[in-house]
UniProtKB/Swiss-Prot annotation:
Mg(2+) 3 binds at N225, S229, E233. Its EC number is 4.2.3.98. The record marks D84, E159 as: Plays a critical role for substrate recognition. Transmembrane segments: none annotated. Disulfide bonds: none annotated. This is (+)-T-muurolol synthase ((2E,6E)-farnesyl diphosphate cyclizing). Residues 354-418 are annotated as: Disordered. InterPro entries: Isoprenoid_synthase_dom_sf (IPR008949), Terpene_cyclase-like_2 (IPR034686). The Asp-Asp-Xaa-Xaa-Xaa-Asp (DDXXXD) motif is important for the catalytic activity, presumably through binding to Mg(2+). Binds 3 Mg(2+) ions per subunit. A motif (DDXXXD motif) lies at residues 83-88. It comes from Streptomyces clavuligerus.
Length: 418
């Protein structure tokens, strides 16, 4: 595989912000997994321990603390173990049994009735996570997480049926549609406000700009994983859908060209993420919106940092990949054009300017601020701390915002010290 340095330059204008207690988070989640009996094979348990899954959760939420962070980390550890034991090794048969198992697994989490999957450690472990999360979420937040989990399982059924039929995803749009959901990203994104101690109002989460940012985050992380994990998957014989394979088949490219095109594709999506985020984070935006969009950006950077150092992904790409806070020039020549995609092209067609939340007179939780004001730190429920009565719940020690001096295009996302 012949690759130039520029072919492996990942555009990511987000600062690295490690968690000061990351090793403790990782130790606790590994102890939890061991106590739950996942993975079930000693060899897989050794691999899970070596990859240090808790470091990813700690990077995603570098200011989170306490039991809610542990529950968040355990959820990601569960996803890693479940993916390796149930998804990567599927032989493509038993689609009916697979769908039934996932339906029962979701019902165990939804109702707590473990008898639906008696003795299954993954069902019991996920039920444990759900019970702990319910302590920190509102009913709406928990329902949103359960719905994201249902969507993830539905995508896994489609993926298994594709394997059974030896369907190689004939188009890039087929791939994009599958990868928006089969990476379980939405199950994590729905918990970003919970783990950081605030509530993003549902009416803000459903605005076009925020919906687009959520989808971009989910796809960016999945695409980055495809690029960085391709060597592992190609040598282990997995039949997972991978962007490099799709580009190779649809564009008749060499492996090196497929990597270059994949990186160019993700860089274009990253550029659009920055553009939309800059439009969403207006002076009138509530602090919860600032924190949520920053959380999305942190997810993208955390995944890159984790993937480039974990034992889970090793190979020629991870050894040579680099991150750049500056825009990477688009790939010259032919390649995928995401803005023309029927699946994700709408990200480039969001009306501009975006309507201000609450501008139509609706009763929305928007507090107008003067341009240049810092977004106040908000507690659970969305109100600034100085408006709350009683002791506030643990929150970030400071707001996290983009640099307001030069805009997101020219600057990185960084903590705003007070």
């Amino acid at each position: 595989m012949s690759l130039n340095h520029s072919d492996l330059m990942f555009y990511c204008p987000v600062d690295d912000l490690p968690h000061p207690a990351a090793s403790g988070v990782n130790d606790r989640t590994l102890d939890w997994a061991s106590g739950q009996g996942i993975p079930t094979a000693d060899r897989d348990a050794g691999r899970l321990r070596a990859m240090a899954p808790g470091l990813l959760a700690a990077r995603i939420a570098p200011d989170a603390r306490g039991p809610v962070l542990d529950a968040f980390a355990d959820h990601h550890t569960w996803l890693f173990a479940f993916d390796d034991e149930y998804c990567d090794r599927a032989d493509g048969s038993g689609i009916t049994e697979w769908a039934s198992f996932l339906a029962r697994l979701h019902r165990v989490v939804e109702t707590g009735e473990s008898a639906l999957l008696p003795g299954n450690p993954y069902g019991l472990a996920l039920r444990d996570i759900a019970c702990r999360l319910s302590t920190y979420t509102t009913p709406a937040q928990l329902a949103e997480w359960l719905e994201a989990l249902r969507s993830y399982f539905a995508a896994l059924v489609w993926e298994r049926s594709r394997r059974r039929d030896d369907d190689r995803l004939q188009s890039l749009d087929d791939y994009l549609l599958l990868r928006l959901r089969n990476g379980a990203m939405h199950t994590s994104i729905t918990l970003l406000d919970t783990v950081n101690g605030y509530v993003l109002p549902r009416e803000l989460r459903e605005t076009p700009g925020v919906r687009a940012l959520v989808e971009m985050t989910a796809l960016l992380v999945s695409v980055d994983n495809d690029i960085l994990s391709h060597h592992k998957e190609s040598t282990s014989g997995t039949r997972e859908a991978n962007l490099l394979d799709v580009l190779g088949r649809t564009g008749h490219t060499t492996p090196g060209e497929a990597v270059a095109q994949a990186v160019a594709l993700r860089n274009e999506i990253m550029r659009q993420f920055v553009r939309v985020a800059e439009r969403v984070r207006t002076p009138a935006a509530v602090p919860e919106l600032y924190r949520f969009t920053t959380g999305l950006a942190r997810w993208i950077r955390a995944n890159l940092d984790f993937s480039l150092t974990t034992t889970r992904y090793t190979g020629p790409v991870t050894e040579r990949a680099a991150l750049s806070p500056h825009e990477v020039p688009p790939l010259s020549g032919q390649g995928p054009a995401p803005a023309r995609s029927d699946v994700i092209g709408w990200w480039w067609r969001i009306p501009e300017p975006l309507p201000e939340p609450g501008s139509d007179g609706a009763d929305t939780p928007v507090r107008k601020r003067r341009a240049g004001d810092r977004p106040p730190t908000a507690g659970r429920g969305g109100a600034p701390h100085h408006q709350r009565t009683g002791p506030p719940p643990p929150v970030l020690p400071g707001g996290i915002t983009a640099s307001r001096s030069s805009g997101l295009q020219q600057s990185t996302w960084r903590r705003e010290h007070r």
